[in-house]
Amino acid sequence: MSKNSVIIVAAGKGKRMNSSISKQFLQIKNKPILYYTLSKFSAHESIDEIVLVTLEDKIEVCSDIIDKYNINKVSKIVPGGKERQDSVYNGLKAVSKDCEVVLIHDAARPFVTSDIIENGIRCANQYGAAACGVIPKDTIKIKNEKEFAIDTPNREDLFIVQTPQCFNYNIILDCHEKLKKHNKKVTDDTMVLENYGKSVYLYEGSYSNIKITTPEDLILGEQILEKLT
């Protein structure tokens, strides 16, 4: 029977947080951010396994969190690579061979909802590739190299991409292998497919599905958690 797998990418060092502790291990309400992220996917009935990708020297820390909070769907913890795309590729190689749909998610994005997960799986099955996100609330400007505004895109045409990003496993693995062969650099997994002419369906995420990257995000995260509990 085919599986739905999720790769949680927790290999970042979080330089923008100005902390010696990686952002996924910082705490909100006395629990690490990674706990909230893992527990959301572990509790979801459509998720069969979790592959956690982290820094090699943080594997034991992650294992302790998994054991402490009894997160039972983590099948493997694997070391990350030099860049995010290398970490994702390591995760793709580690998922079960009968995986059909794989979701790729930021460890520092702990407020993903059950609906976002379910819709991602559905859209990946239907379209082959999908990513959640939101329309920007602010007006966006395009600037030139001299810092002057040169254009104002229609907000309705813009989309702030979040995670999970969800794919047919064979499609995303094939594109990542091509990317590695051609030595191309990307900032997220939708770009991996776009590099090879594949379309990515965009579906509704949530303004609360934030990535905790800065100290200000940590404060906002506490407020979001207050509303959710």
Swiss-Prot record:
List the pathway annotation. Isoprenoid biosynthesis; isopentenyl diphosphate biosynthesis via DXP pathway; isopentenyl diphosphate from 1-deoxy-D-xylulose 5-phosphate: step 2/6
Gene3D superfamilies, sorted: Spore Coat Polysaccharide Biosynthesis Protein SpsA, Chain A
- Keyword Repeat included in the entry's annotation: no
Taxonomically, the superkingdom here is: Bacteria
PROSITE patterns the record matches: ISPD
- List site positions: Positions MEP for the nucleophilic attack: R155, K211
Q: Which InterPro entries match?
A: IspD, IspD/TarI, IspD/TarI_cytidylyltransf_bact, ISPD_synthase_CS, Nucleotide-diphossugar_trans
* Entry keyword annotation includes Transferase: yes
| Record's function text | Catalyzes the formation of 4-diphosphocytidyl-2-C-methyl-D-erythritol from CTP and 2-C-methyl-D-erythritol 4-phosphate (MEP).
NCBIfam families in UniProt: ispD, PRK00155.1-3
Q: What is this protein called?
A: 2-C-methyl-D-erythritol 4-phosphate cytidylyltransferase
- Organism of provenance: Clostridium botulinum (strain Langeland / NCTC 10281 / Type F)
